């Protein structure tokens, strides 16, 4: 996956959606979690969910891990009183049973081993604690990048999009929770609405080279990029452009 980019590029590309998603996800994941309890943000990126958890629990009660060094540094700058380290979900650097909540916002579909990553989240969560995750509904065409990938498929039917990633189709995220041994799994959806003042504002973020969408665009020559841009323009409404993005979400208990 193309996440060898700056934290600023990632925040510009996905932060417009992950920032409003974080409070909704925290409401779901953190129900029943309060003062005196500890939370872990897995795959924290530049820190959208980390900051939301810190706002609710206090930064001293929040830990975060992120495999990208630049993203981890950005999260640490954003929440300097929280503990932020560099680690992958599949190999969490914590003993068993230390957190009341382990949450992964927009991460599971990019894990090398999603079941293993969720199992690790369960391992570090105390008995009766909560494990939570959410991923965009890429397979159902309700993700924040769905218009882009629809345009891609219309021009290049053989292109790989994000619809085959783990957890992005109906029921699959909850299935991964069950396979990871988490009990009491419940599934729902979370939806955010993001307004772009113009098509140019919407399109510019894709040129930053972030994630599979950015990598695909970067792989095209100038003529094919221009054709894709115009195809996207035809698919999107007139300015301003409002994108509704829906994520699958699941919770389970250890």
Region spans (language model):
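Conserved Class I S-adenosyl-L-methionine
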Residues: 3, 17-18, 46-48, 165-254
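Class I SAM-dependent methyltransferase Rossmann-like catalytic core
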Residues: 4-16
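Conserved alpha-helix/loop element of class I SAM-dependent methyltransferases that forms part
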Residues: 16-35, 52
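Class I SAM-dependent methyltransferase SAM/SAH-binding core
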Residues: 38-92
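A short acidic, Gly/Pro-enriched loop at the edge of an enzyme's catalytic core
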Residues: 90-101
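A short SAM/SAH-binding and catalytic strip from SAM-dependent methyltransferases
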Residues: 100-114, 137
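Conserved catalytic/acceptor-binding region of the Class I
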Residues: 115-116, 122, 126, 130-197, ...
